[in-house]
């Protein structure tokens, strides 16, 4: 069941004073970052990041290796909590609620904000059991409900026609591209509100990459999608908005077409034209 998505509590007028924060109406903001710094022990990885992630759009994070793209992405569902010594200063508001509030239910947060990693990671189970894994954890075991969820999620992930006759075969027998789409199906089966994709195509061949990119385009009508990519052509193809990061700082953030054709910062222009990075 999709929950009503509260948008209260966002101080949008104050955010507009920050250069990198999009001028968005309150109801169109999915994730608000009013100023986030992150540390691994004594090392600072993110420096006062401020941006708004638009609802039901695709936002790409680009930048050279080690610039903080994945660190920022993983902050949105607190995956960085799993790293020893990680410490956060600031806030991240998901539909107006600070996910770093003391006592936050992190398991529920990660259901609402699903994540797909660089390398496809299907479980050593059947295709069917991969898709229903999260539902079973929630205590949902009624066969009719699970069957409907499997069909819906696999169709949404553009995989149903390829696997509908072998749902009870091992997911490990799928191709890399099929496995990645299966992982996306597994993620959306629990009905998240946001999808985080950490270089989801870097291990895939060009044809599989195209299928995943087409899927991203289809899914944005229902989900807010944030993608980390080293491939600037991919960012230009799939995203509505793009953020360029460098050495843990947000250099520029805005409409993808504008950022690639008329960047406001020389540092951005140098990166997208291949002068460094």
From Swiss-Prot:
SUPFAM superfamilies per UniProt: P-loop containing nucleoside triphosphate hydrolases (SSF52540)
Pfam families tied to this protein: ABC_tran (PF00005)
Membrane topology, as annotated: Peripheral membrane protein
Subcellular location: Cell inner membrane
GO cellular component: plasma membrane
SMART domains: AAA (SM00382)
Keyword Membrane among record annotations: yes
Protein's GO biological process: phosphate ion transmembrane transport
Protein name: Phosphate import ATP-binding protein PstB 2
Organism in which the protein naturally occurs: Pseudomonas syringae pv. tomato (strain ATCC BAA-871 / DC3000)
